[in-house]
């Protein structure tokens, strides 16, 4: 391997580590569009499975009908403010996502909710009994990672 190949491998490993750290966050910020196309920002606890984010949210929450009726959104994970030296270049990853409802009779529904409860706690069991909650898959189609000043990457 050449020196530049080694440097690229090290850089890729560093980026993968930073991306992995962002994915350890327990909530994801969600940008969706209201019926009048005005933007709405919100958040939800999530779990990842097979390259997608899954959120379990009430239809009464303003963002839920947005994600169901206009199934394109952006989501973002950010580094913790308390561990960020310079908030102007706070580490973050943003994804454009396609949104799909996972029906309760789909075997994936039970699998994901088990994973979600392991990650987010017992509240998931209670929410599962409420009929107005929807499991929504947020499937990334493209992403953008910012790790510092002048250090942004699209993938």
Short names for language-model regions:
Residues 1-155:
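Binding-site signature for planar aromatic cofactors or substrates
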């Amino acid at each position: 391997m050449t020196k530049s190949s080694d440097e690229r491998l090290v850089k890729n490993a560093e980026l993968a580590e930073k991306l992995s750290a962002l994915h350890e966050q327990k909530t994801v910020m969600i940008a969706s569009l209201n019926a009048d196309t005005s933007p709405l920002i919100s958040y939800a606890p999530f779990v990842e499975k097979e390259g997608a984010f899954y959120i379990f949210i009430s239809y009464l929450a303003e963002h839920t009908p947005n994600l169901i009726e206009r199934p394109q959104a952006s989501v973002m994970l950010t580094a913790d403010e308390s561990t960020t030296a310079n908030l102007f270049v706070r580490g973050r990853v943003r994804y454009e996502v396609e949104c799909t409802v996972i029906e309760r009779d789909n075997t994936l529904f039970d699998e994901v909710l088990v994973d979600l409860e392991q990650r987010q706690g017992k509240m998931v069991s209670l929410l599962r009994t409420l009929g107005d909650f929807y499991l929504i898959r947020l499937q990334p189609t493209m992403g953008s990672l910012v790790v510092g000043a002048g250090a942004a990457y699209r993938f």
